[in-house]
Design a protein with these regions (language model features):
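Conserved phosphate-binding elements of NTP-dependent enzyme cores
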Residues: 1-960
C-alpha cells in the first residue's frame, strides 16, 4: 500500500461526531462501520459527501444556484484530497410510473437502438418478411423475375383512403395516363368520372406496359424511376396473364399486399414518445379502472354530503374551492341531490376539463383548470390494448431472432444475457456490423446487473416496485457501466436484501470499481464485506452521545494480524523485527512498523467492538434449544401471486420463524403481499388487495397482527420518542400536579409544545427558526426568544424534582428512566426503550433524525411495554438493516422475549446471525424471479444446514 494518497478529514463535528479527525486512503475499498447511531452516516454522508457536493455547487453560476439550491457547509474544519463524489444511497428511485429498470440503466435505450437499426419487419397481414430495395435492385428484380412476360408497371398513389378523387383522375388523364387499377379492378381512365366518396380506395396508376428484355432495359429503368416518383418510393408489378401482383419499395413493404411501414427509429420503440407508445394508455401499461356507480353509489345524496365518495364531505380545501367555482359557473347547488344535477357537470368533476374556473377573490384570484378526481382513484388494470407492454401495435411487427422488443424487455436478466450472447450468429453481414458495438454495450451493462445479484429482474419492471436495496444496486451497476475514473463512490449498505450467495458477486463489483481507478467507501455492517475491505473505519464506541469517536482507521490485514504487505507480496524477505505482536490491553494485533511505516501515522487503532466480532473474540451464539411451538398453525393454500407457484405453507405458531431465500425468490410475495393484507383486512377492516390465493387456514389461532418496519415513528420534526411512546402525556400530567403549576393555574396543555399557551410563540415550540435566504439555502437558527428551549419563561419556571419540562425533554432516555423510576406508567415504557439499546437517544429528539434501525427498535419497545394477549403475530422485514453486531444481539433478545410471551414472530431475513437463532426456517427458491416461488426446504436451522435442496443451508452450516 505504498505511495497512497489520502483524504484527510480534520475536526468533523456533524451531529454526534466529536471533533473527529482521520485519514482515509484513496483508490482503496474502505468500509465504515459502527453501531446504529454511532455517527457512520454523519461521517460518510453528512461530512465527506456534503463537502464534495458543496464544492461542486460552488463551481456553478449564481443564476444556476438559485434554481438548484446550495448545500450548507458541513461542520468540519477541513477536508483535503477529495475527489468528485457520487453517493449511491438506499433510497428508492421514485414513483414515476414511466420509469423502469430498462430506462434507468439505459439498457432499454441501447435495445431501442438495436431494434431500430437491425430488426426485421414482418407483415401484419401475411406474416412474411417485409423488404426494402434500392432503385437498381428494383430494376434488376423486375428484369429477372418478369423476363419475357407481359406485365403492368404500376405506381400506388392512394392507399386505403376515402374520397371521390375527381381532381386526381382528371390530373392523370391530362398527363397522358390511360389506365388505373382501382380497388383491384383494371379500369380505363376515360370511362371513370369519380369514385364513391364514402368508401376507402386503393388506386394504382398504370405507368407502363412491359415485356422485360435486355434491349428494353433503359426504357424499363426510366419507367421504374417514374413509377417510384409517383408512388413515393413504391411500385407494383401485375402479371397480365395470372393477374398476380408483387410490390417493390425503397421503404419497408409487404411483397404480397403492398402494405408499407415507416422506417423504424429509436423513438418508434419508446413508450415515452407519441411515435412509440400505446395510444390507449399513453405508455403507462395500466389504465385507471373507473366505475361511476362505485364513485357515486347513491345519487340521492348531494356532493356536499359526500355523494362523490373520493371527494368526501364538503370542507375547506383547494379541490372544493375549484368545485365551488364550477358550481357558480354552471348555476348549480352543491347541496342538491346529485340526480338533479346536469350529467356534464358530474362528468367534469370526475374526469376533469381544460376549461378555466376563477378561484379566490380580488387580487388574489386566479384562473385554473380542474384535473378531475380520476387521479385520486388508485384502482388500475392492465391496458387491454397493449396488454401492459406500453407500446403501440406497430412495434410488434419488428423482430430480432423472432422476438419483439416487448418480449425481450419482459425477460429476466439471466435470460436476457443468454439471448444477447446467442445473437452473434443471427444477424446478416450488414446488420452484424451495425449491431456489433450496440451488442457489446448491452452485454456489458446486463453483465453488471448480474454481478450485483439482480438476475431475477426484468427491463420492464417498474422502478416504483423496487426495494431500496434493489434501487441502490441498479445505480451501482449503472455507475460501473459508466466507466468513470478518479471518483469517490460512497454507498450506504449495498448488501441490504442480498442473499449470501449474491453478496460475493456484489463485493467483486465494488472491487471492480476500485480497480478501475476509483475510491470506494461503503457504510456497512456485513461481516463478509468488512473482511474484503482494504481499510476499515470503526465509529463508536457507542451510539448517540456515546459515539462520534474514531475507534479504528487502519488496513484490515494489519488489524487482523495478517503480515502481508507490499514487500511480502513482491517476494522480498521480511526483516526479523517484522513479527506480529499483540497488545495485551486491547487484544489488537499491532502494525509491523517495518512493513507499514508509510501508513503508521495515518492509522488509528483503539478498542473496537466490531473487531472483536471479526476476530471471533465476541459472537452471537445460537440458542441451545429450539422451541416446539404451541401445536397450532397459520396456513396459506394456493398462493400464486407474482412468481409464487401455488404454494401451500403452514407456519407453526408460538415460534420465532425465519423466511430465507435468494433475492426475488418470493419471500415478500408470500408474507407482505399475500398473508399480511389478508390479516389486515380481517383484523382492522382494511381494504387491501392481496395477491391471488385459495384460502387462509388457522386464522382463529391469532388475534392480532403487528407489522414492525423501519419507517419513521413520525413524519414531522415535532414527533419524538416522548410523544411516540405516550410518556409525554404522563410527564405533562406530573408537571400539572406540581404545587407551582396549581398556584399558576396551569393545566397539562400548558406543557405541550404543539399548542398555543405555554410554548414559545416566536418559534411555535420548535426551539429553532427557519430563515429563508434568497440565493442561499434556508438556515436553521436557534430561536432568540426562548434560546432553543421551546417554552415561555413562566412555563419553564415550573419544576418537577428540580427539572423543568425542557430539561426533561433533553435527557437521554437512560437518564430519564432513572429520573422517573418511581412512576410506573412512565418507567415501564422507558425501561423498554433502554432494554432495546436506545438509552442514548434524547427523550425529545426529533423523529426525523432517527435511523431506520432506531425507529424499528422504538416500535419493538412500544410492543414490549404493552400487556399483550400472547396470540399476536409480529412480522418484520429485514430488521437487521443498519444494525451492528451488538444491535443485532439486542434485537434478537427482544424478538425472543416476544415469543417467550406466547406470540409468534415471522422475520424475513438474510442475516445468518438471525437465521441461526430462529426456531424454524422456510427457505424459498431455488432461484429468483420465474425460477423461484417455491419452498425448497423447511425445518430447524440444523435441519436446513444438512438439506441438499436448501440454498441457505450451506451458509448456515458455516456458522452453526
Amino acid at each position: 500500500m505504498k505511495n497512497k494518497e489520502y483524504i484527510d478529514i480534520v475536526g468533523a463535528k456533524a451531529h454526534n461526531l466529536k471533533n473527529a479527525s482521520l485519514s482515509i486512503p484513496r483508490n482503496q475499498f474502505v468500509v465504515v462501520t459502527g453501531l446504529s447511531g454511532s455517527g457512520k452516516s454523519s461521517l460518510a454522508f453528512d461530512t465527506i459527501y456534503a463537502e464534495g457536493q458543496r464544492r461542486y455547487m460552488d463551481t456553478l453560476s449564481t443564476y444556476a444556484k438559485h434554481f438548484m439550491g446550495i448545500l450548507e457547509k458541513p461542520d468540519v474544519e477541513s477536508i483535503t484530497g477529495l475527489s468528485p463524489i457520487i453517493a449511491i444511497e438506499q433510497k428508492t428511485t421514485g414513483n414515476n410510473p414511466r420509469s423502469t429498470v430498462g430506462t434507468i440503466t439505459e439498457i432499454y435505450d441501447f435495445l431501442r437502438l438495436l431494434y431500430a437499426r437491425a430488426s426485421i419487419a414482418y407483415s401484419p397481414q401475411t406474416g412474411k418478411e417485409m423488404v426494402r430495395y434500392s432503385d437498381e435492385q428494383i430494376v434488376s428484380l423486375i428484369m429477372e423475375n418478369y423476363a419475357g412476360r407481359k406485365c403492368y408497371l404500376m405506381a400506388p398513389i392512394v392507399r386505403g383512403r376515402k374520397g371521390h378523387y375527381k381532381e386526381l383522375l382528371e390530373q392523370m388523364r391530362k398527363r397522358g395516363y390511360t389506365q388505373m387499377r382501382i380497388d383491384g379492378q383494371l379500369c380505363e381512365l376515360n370511362e371513370i368520372d369519380a369514385l364513391d366518396r364514402y368508401k376507402a380506395h386503393f388506386i394504382e396508376l398504370v405507368v407502363d406496359r412491359l415485356k422485360p428484355s435486355l434491349k428494353d432495359e433503359k426504357r424499363i429503368k426510366d419507367s421504374v424511376m417514374s413509377a417510384l416518383n409517383l408512388g413515393k418510393g413504391s411500385v407494383a408489378i401485375m402479371d397480365m396473364e395470372t393477374e398476380e401482383v408483387h410490390h417493390y419499395s425503397k421503404h419497408l413493404v409487404c411483397p404480397d399486399t403492398g402494405l408499407s411501414l415507416a422506417e423504424p427509429a429509436p423513438h418508434s420503440f419508446s413508450f415515452n414518445s407519441p411515435q412509440g407508445y400505446c395510444p390507449h394508455c399513453k405508455g403507462l401499461g395500466m389504465i385507471v379502472n373507473i366505475d361511476v356507480d362505485t364513485i357515486i353509489p347513491d345519487r340521492s345524496v348531494s356532493i356536499a354530503d359526500g355523494g362523490i365518495v373520493p371527494l368526501g364531505k364538503i370542507r375547506e380545501t383547494r379541490k372544493f374551492d375549484i368545485i365551488r367555482s364550477i358550481a357558480r359557473k354552471y348555476g348549480i347547488s352543491l347541496y342538491d341531490p346529485i340526480e338533479e344535477l346536469p350529467d356534464e357537470v358530474i362528468s367534469l368533476i370526475i374526469f376533469g376539463s381544460d376549461e378555466l374556473f376563477r378561484v379566490g377573490e380580488g387580487t388574489s384570484s386566479e384562473m385554473v383548470s380542474f384535473p378531475g378526481i380520476v387521479g385520486d382513484i388508485n384502482e388500475k388494470i392492465v391496458c387491454p390494448v397493449c396488454g401492459g407492454t406500453r407500446l403501440n401495435k406497430e412495434t410488434t411487427y419488428f423482430k430480432i431472432d423472432g422476438k419483439t422488443i416487448s418480449e425481450v424487455a419482459a425477460m429476466e436478466i439471466t435470460q436476457l444475457s443468454e439471448w444477447l450472447h446467442s445473437l452473434d450468429g443471427v444477424f446478416a453481414k450488414r446488420e452484424s456490423l451495425i449491431a456489433r458495438d450496440i451488442l457489446k454495450e448491452l452485454k456489458d451493462r446486463v453483465g453488471f446487473l448480474l454481478d450485483v445479484g439482480l438476475d431475477y429482474l426484468s427491463l420492464d419492471r417498474a422502478t416504483a416496485s423496487l426495494s431500496g436495496g434493489e434501487s441502490q444496486r441498479i445505480r451501482l451497476a449503472t455507475q460501473i457501466g459508466s466507466k468513470l475514473v478518479n471518483v469517490l463512490y460512497i454507498l450506504d449498505e449495498p448488501s441490504i436484501g442480498l442473499h449470501q450467495r449474491d453478496n460475493r458477486k456484489l463485493i467483486a463489483s465494488l472491487k471492480k470499481l476500485r480497480d478501475e481507478g476509483n475510491s470506494v467507501m461503503v457504510v456497512e455492517h456485513d461481516a463478509e464485506t468488512m473482511m474484503a475491505a482494504d481499510w476499515l473505519v470503526d465509529v463508536g464506541p457507542g451510539a448517540g452521545n456515546d459515539g462520534g469517536h474514531i475507534c479504528l482507521s487502519a488496513p484490515l490485514d494489519v488489524l487482523l494480524g495478517d503480515c502481508r504487505s507490499e514487500s511480502a507480496t513482491t517476494g522480498t524477505e521480511l526483516p526479523a523485527d517484522a513479527e506480529a505482536s499483540v497488545d495485551p490491553q486491547s487484544g489488537l494485533y499491532s502494525a509491523r512498523r517495518s512493513i507499514c511505516r508509510e501508513d503508521a501515522d495515518k492509522m488509528i487503532v483503539g478498542h473496537s467492538a466490531t473487531l472483536d466480532y471479526l476476530t471471533g473474540r465476541k459472537a452471537i451464539e445460537a440458542p441451545t434449544r429450539r422451541r416446539k411451538g404451541n401445536g397450532q398453525t397459520l396456513g396459506i393454500r394456493g398462493a400464486r401471486g407474482n412468481n409464487l407457484k401455488s404454494v401451500d405453507v403452514d407456519f407453526p405458531l408460538g415460534m420465532l420463524i425465519g423466511i430465507a431465500g435468494v433475492s426475488g425468490s418470493g419471500k415478500s410475495s408470500i408474507i407482505n403481499e399475500t398473508l399480511m393484507p389478508v390479516l389486515k383486512n380481517r383484523f382492522y377492516n382494511a381494504k387491501l388487495q392481496p395477491l391471488p390465493y385459495d384460502e387462509i387456514v388457522g386464522i382463529e389461532n391469532i388475534d392480532k397482527l403487528i407489522e414492525i418496519d423501519q419507517s419513521p415513528i413520525g413524519r414531522t420534526p415535532r414527533s419524538n420518542p416522548a410523544t411516540f411512546t405516550g410518556v409525554f402525556n404522563d410527564i405533562r400530567n406530573l408537571f400539572e400536579a406540581t404545587p407551582d403549576a396549581k398556584i399558576r393555574g396551569y393545566k397539562a396543555g400548558r406543557f405541550s409544545f404543539n399548542v398555543p399557551g405555554g410554548r414559545c410563540e416566536e418559534c411555535k415550540g420548535a426551539g429553532i427558526k427557519v430563515i429563508e435566504m434568497n440565493f442561499l439555502p434556508s438556515v436553521n437558527v436557534v430561536c432568540n426568544e426562548c434560546r432553543g428551549r421551546r417554552y415561555k419563561s413562566d412555563t419553564l419556571a415550573v419544576k418537577y424534582k428540580g427539572k423543568n419540562i425542557n430539561d426533561v425533554l433533553e435527557m437521554p432516555i437512560s437518564e430519564a428512566y432513572e429520573f422517573f423510576e418511581t412512576i410506573p406508567s412512565i418507567a415501564q415504557k422507558l425501561k423498554a426503550l433502554v432494554d432495546v439499546g436506545l438509552g442514548y437517544v434524547r427523550l425529545g429528539q426529533s423523529a426525523v433524525t432517527l435511523s431506520g434501525g432506531e425507529s424499528q427498535r422504538m416500535k419493538l419497545a412500544a410492543e414490549l411495554a404493552k400487556k399483550g394477549t400472547g396470540n399476536t403475530l409480529y412480522i418484520l422485514d429485514e430488521p437487521t438493516t443498519g444494525l451492528h453486531f451488538d444491535d443485532i444481539k439486542v434485537l434478537l433478545g427482544v424478538m425472543q422475549q416476544l415469543v417467550d410471551q406466547g406470540n409468534t414472530v415471522i422475520v424475513i431475513e438474510h442475516n445468518l446471525d438471525i437465521l441461526k437463532s430462529v426456531d424454524y426456517i422456510f427457505d424459498m427458491g431455488p432461484e429468483g424471479g420465474k425460477a423461484g416461488g417455491l419452498i425448497v426446504a423447511e425445518g430447524t436451522p440444523e435441519q436446513l444446514s444438512s438439506n441438499p435442496d436448501s440454498v441457505t443451508g450451506p451458509f448456515l452450516a458455516e456458522v452453526l
